[in-house]
């Protein structure tokens, strides 16, 4: 009995040590999970944060006759006569026929259905996501969580989701060599949309880390890269070598 009791005490002591060690290390793991560090500290990102009180987000693809606008120049020439456009950029990835590769909703009408297929390329890296606009509310959700609603006025599918609830996608890593111009849309801690365009080539991790550390973004969806451009009110309209399909604007209300 004395031997069994000694074993019991030893087990209790050992377990207490393990619990203490786990509690001691837990905050360190939490910090490591929450923090990120830019592998390229010189990275700069052009960003525009939407004010839902005075601005609205809209999306464009084709004119009433079915012809695509194709460029920021053409789009702004048609919609910006009153100077209401504060920001405009290209939206999600498109297919070989110059149509959105996944879900696209414009003015409450679904133009292209949700794409749940598997494939190669950034668009198919999981999880993919949908950026949507419903009145003054904006959001980014996983493909499997998206539900159609008559309240959704605009939506575009893309991928991958680079960040969810402040956590960078574990599929992307800081040491990945793939470096390109990136653009995306995020939701910050206040629930406002943030549009981003890297000013130089970068990898997914640094793009997400910048959004998290500098812009308080908690959800981030990759839109496109290499061909991407952003127009901001007061600046020049970027020259494009390649056409855009979907384009996203931020416009002054009223």
Curated annotation (Swiss-Prot):
Q: What is this protein called?
A: Uncharacterized protein YigE
Q: Which gene encodes it?
A: yigE
Q: Which InterPro entries match?
A: NAGPA
- Protein species of origin: Escherichia coli (strain K12)
């Amino acid at each position: 009995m004395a031997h069994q009791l000694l074993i019991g005490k030893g087990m209790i002591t050992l377990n207490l040590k393990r619990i203490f060690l786990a509690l001691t290390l837990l905050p360190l793991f939490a910090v490591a999970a929450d923090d990120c560090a830019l592998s390229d500290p010189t990275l700069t990102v052009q960003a525009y944060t939407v004010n839902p009180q005075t601005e609205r987000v809209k999306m464009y693809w084709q004119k009433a006759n079915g012809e695509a606008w194709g460029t920021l120049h053409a789009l702004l020439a048609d919609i910006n006569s009153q100077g209401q456009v504060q920001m405009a950029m290209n939206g999600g990835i498109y297919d070989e026929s110059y149509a959105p590769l996944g879900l696209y909703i414009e003015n409450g009408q679904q133009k292209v259905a949700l794409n749940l297929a598997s494939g190669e390329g950034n668009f198919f890296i999981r999880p993919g996501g949908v950026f949507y606009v419903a009145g003054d509310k904006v959001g980014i959700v996983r493909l499997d969580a998206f539900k159609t609603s008559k309240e959704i006025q605009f939506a575009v599918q893309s991928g991958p989701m680079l960040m969810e609830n402040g956590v960078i996608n574990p599929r992307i890593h800081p040491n990945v060599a793939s470096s390109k111009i990136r653009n995306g849309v995020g939701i910050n801690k206040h629930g406002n949309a943030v549009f981003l365009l890297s000013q130089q080539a970068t990898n997914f991790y640094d793009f997400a880390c910048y959004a998290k550390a500098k812009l308080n973004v908690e959800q981030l969806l990759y839109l496109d890269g290499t061909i991407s451009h952003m127009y901001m009110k007061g600046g020049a309209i970027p020259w494009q070598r390649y056409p855009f399909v979907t384009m996203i604007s931020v416009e002054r209300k009223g």
